Amino acid sequence: MAKEGTTVIGVPYYAGQNPYQAGIVPPNAIYGDPLGAPIQQTIYRDTPAPFNCLYCGNTGLTNLRSKPGVAAVVACMMPFMLGFCFLCPSMDCLWNKQHHCPQCGNKVADFEKSDPCLVMDPPQWKQPSFALPA
């Protein structure tokens, strides 16, 4: 029972009237991710955060710069009345944070302490850093 071998061409490919249906890529096709829209939302708190810089395109961790805010001033008034004025610079957890790109130096985000009467934040006390893997 030998079968005769015939050449099979395969499934015929029919192209329609639209050239894009024939496999041509349209000229306005978007390849990859758009550069201006963030893929994920970065939460900027008082620790370095992973980010994508909108100015230079760098990917990495932000550099933090601390600036005294209202919460730091109110918290420093209490020890100052008791004579402990050396505690003012050591209360870094109450200072506002500015996140900067390490490559170009542009400011990426601000994190401000919103409640001047809150000296410590117990629910967020053990919040893990976004920069370190869990």
Curated annotation (Swiss-Prot):
What triggers its expression?
Answer: Up-regulated by Pseudomonas syringae avrRpt2 and fumonisin B1 (FB1).
Membrane topology according to the record: Peripheral membrane protein
Write out the GO cellular component annotations: plasma membrane
Q: Which family does it belong to?
A: Belongs to the CDIP1/LITAF family.
What is the protein's given name?
GSH-induced LITAF domain protein
Q: Give the PANTHER family listed for this entry.
A: FI16602P1-RELATED (PTHR23292:SF6), LIPOPOLYSACCHARIDE-INDUCED TUMOR NECROSIS FACTOR-ALPHA FACTOR (PTHR23292)
Q: Which GO terms describe its molecular function?
A: metal ion binding
Q: Quote the gene name from the UniProt entry.
A: GILP
Q: Name one GO biological process term.
A: cellular response to hypoxia
Q: Where does Zn(2+) bind?
A: C53, C56, C101, C104
Alphabetically sorted, this entry's keywords are: Cell membrane, Membrane, Metal-binding, Zinc
Chain segments carrying region Membrane-binding amphipathic helix: 68-88
Assembly and oligomerization? Interacts (via N- and C-terminal) with MIEL1 and LSD1 (via N-terminus).
Source organism: Arabidopsis thaliana
